[in-house]
Amino acid sequence: MCSSDLPANALPDAGQRSLIGMAPAFAAACHRLRRVAPTRATVLFVGESGVGKELFARMLHDIGPNPRGPFVSVNCAAIPDTLVESELFGVERGAFTSATQSREGRFERADGGTLFLDEISSLTMVAQGKLLRALQEGEIERVGGTTTIKVDVRVVAASNVDLRDEVKAGRFREDLFFRLNVFPNHIPALRDRRDDIPL
């Protein structure tokens, strides 16, 4: 059981998001989660759709250094390409026709906490470049803005495809891949966790 050795009294909401499983592959994923949680390292969860990558990301946040900070989740595949930059980095008033007021992006909303970027392989190359800058410099710039904004955010990403293949195909930046792949964690599918099926 992944949650058996976690001090629940120190984890807000941790009991509601316990990760339970006995299969060796699942136990290994939980072990890697506990090992990286106290650090500020960027984590990349890899696994098929439906294996619980967001649940792992939330548990990582709950047992990490800033559990009381915000946890902001973004499904990158669900955001139209034309809006992804303004959603992630915010927008200044007048940046485009419908921008009638300035608005924070997900990075600013996650300041002091965790930003979970699901289906990260779907980001445009332009958005990937801005994300790389945010990871390297700890700052962002809103769409239509000229001022840099410092953000203190732990970025956690997830993908259901092998990003190495995306890099080879020219669809994903190699430098961003290396920034995200600091601590990869593969989440096994249920068919690979036969010991857990009776649970």
Predicted regions span which residues?
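AAA+ ATPase active-site-proximal loops
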Residues: 7-150, 155-161, 166, 190
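Short, well-ordered beta-strand elements within core beta-sheets of diverse protein domains
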Residues: 184-192
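Basic, polyanion-binding surface patches
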Residues: 170
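Conserved small/polar residues in nucleotide/adenosyl-binding loops
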Residues: 1-6
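Conserved Sensor-2/SRH helix of P-loop NTPases
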Residues: 197-198
